[in-house]
């Protein structure tokens, strides 16, 4: 027979603990038994409601109970979930496999996880605040609550036109199904919408970075409603421009000038690097494309014999490297590098920097998405100079980008 809940004894215990300077809340708090009784009564009530006359006629009956420990704001309690013969009882007050019931605690756990805290650090926080340490599995199950949100976010429809888009990948180590640490690339597509707001259009995990996978990324954007991209800013990955223009043939592609400079200087002797960079600056900082091409000829005359591969790389990629000269200084500053998406990556790395190897692709995706979710809270205002940027774009691209 179930022992009746003795409210008087709980009250007396609470008074004694107050006199002794002990807490009412937490693992050994006086209020936990009261909450435990209420929760168990609620579960019993749910089972009574479940076992309707129709259920009973079908032979369904109570079939014992299953105990589990549940963390609450008042401390840890033991709940006894009733079971039925047909295993059709699905409690809602305390759901199956739910082990944390404290109001706001699940959100707090997800918030701590989003800041890069490990499950051990979160467990320590719970011990300090709830009075009981929790293992990694329940914490991981709490953070899994964000997975349906990620799925919905990744399949959401997008705007039809984005004036500027940056595409770049960030790399992490992940444990694969064999238990080996492997490299994973997260492909990020960061755009500016018509109103000048930043928007992460999508993130995609793959085994490595390549033009073929970028093609699938671009196809996904198209399937989600993106009909046109005016300017795409990318690094120098081979085949990338062709992948873009196979899906968006009218898109202007700007190769990252900074990437090109970094790649160039690696093949210039250390004693000549300072002078070479000074001459190269005259090319990419020229006032217009015509002047830049004259400076590129001078660069070839001076350094072409000594560093032919470097000069040839600039010449072969010139059309995509010099796209930015067609635009105003404000637009040039935005598009001649992939600094915008790299800046986003730096913010992500602040959260992930202490993670050596992620246990799975899912764990990686959860943390990066939650970090992004915090970052996007700051993307409430359009770019400061959007008015001076959008109007020249509207004039240049005409029907493709109407402001009014």
What are these regions (language model features)?
Residues 1-99:
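Short, conserved DNA-binding cores of transcription-related domains
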Residues 249, 282-404:
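Acidic/histidine-rich catalytic cores and adjacent linkers
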């Amino acid at each position: 027979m179930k022992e009746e809940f003795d409210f008087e004894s709980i009250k007396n215990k609470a008074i004694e603990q107050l006199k002794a300077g002990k807490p009412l809340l937490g693992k050994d708090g006086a209020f936990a038994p009261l909450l435990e009784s209420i929760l168990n009564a609620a579960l019993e009530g749910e089972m009574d409601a479940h076992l309707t006359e129709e259920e009973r006629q079908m032979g369904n009956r109570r079939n014992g109970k299953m105990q589990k420990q549940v963390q609450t704001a008042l401390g840890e309690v033991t709940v006894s979930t009733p079971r039925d013969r047909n295993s059709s009882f699905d409690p809602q007050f305390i759901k199956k496999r739910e082990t944390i019931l404290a109001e706001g605690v699940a959100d707090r756990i997800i918030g701590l996880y989003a800041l890069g805290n490990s499950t051990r650090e979160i467990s320590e926080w719970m011990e300090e605040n709830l009075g009981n340490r929790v293992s990694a599995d329940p914490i991981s199950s709490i953070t899994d609550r964000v997975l349906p949100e990620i799925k919905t976010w990744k399949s959401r429809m997008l705007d039809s036109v984005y004036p500027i888009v940056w595409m770049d990948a960030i790399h992490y180590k992940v444990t694969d199904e064999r238990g080996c640490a492997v490299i994973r690339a997260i492909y990020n597509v960061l755009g500016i919408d018509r109103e000048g707001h930043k928007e992460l259009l999508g993130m995609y995990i793959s085994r490595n970075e390549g033009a073929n996978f970028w093609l699938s990324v671009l196809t996904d954007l198209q399937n989600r409603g993106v009909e046109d991209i005016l300017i795409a800013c990318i690094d120098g990955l081979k085949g990338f421009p062709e992948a873009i223009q196979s899906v968006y043939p009218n898109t202007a592609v700007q190769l990252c000038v900074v990437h090109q400079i970094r790649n160039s200087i690696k093949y210039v002797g250390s004693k000549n690097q300072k002078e070479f960079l000074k001459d190269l600056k005259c090319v990419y900082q020229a006032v217009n494309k015509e002047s830049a091409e004259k400076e590129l000829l001078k660069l070839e005359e001076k350094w072409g014999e000594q560093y032919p591969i470097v000069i040839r790389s600039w010449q072969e990629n010139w059309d995509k490297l010099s796209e930015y000269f067609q635009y105003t200084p404000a637009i040039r500053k935005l598009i001649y590098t992939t600094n915008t998406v790299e800046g986003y990556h730096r913010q992500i790395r602040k959260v992930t920097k202490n993670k050596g190897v992620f246990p799975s692709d899912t764990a990686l995706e959860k943390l990066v998405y939650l970090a992004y979710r915090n970052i996007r809270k700051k993307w409430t205002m359009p770019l400061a100079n959007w008015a001076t940027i959008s109007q020249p774009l509207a004039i240049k691209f005409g029907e493709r980008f109407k402001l009014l």
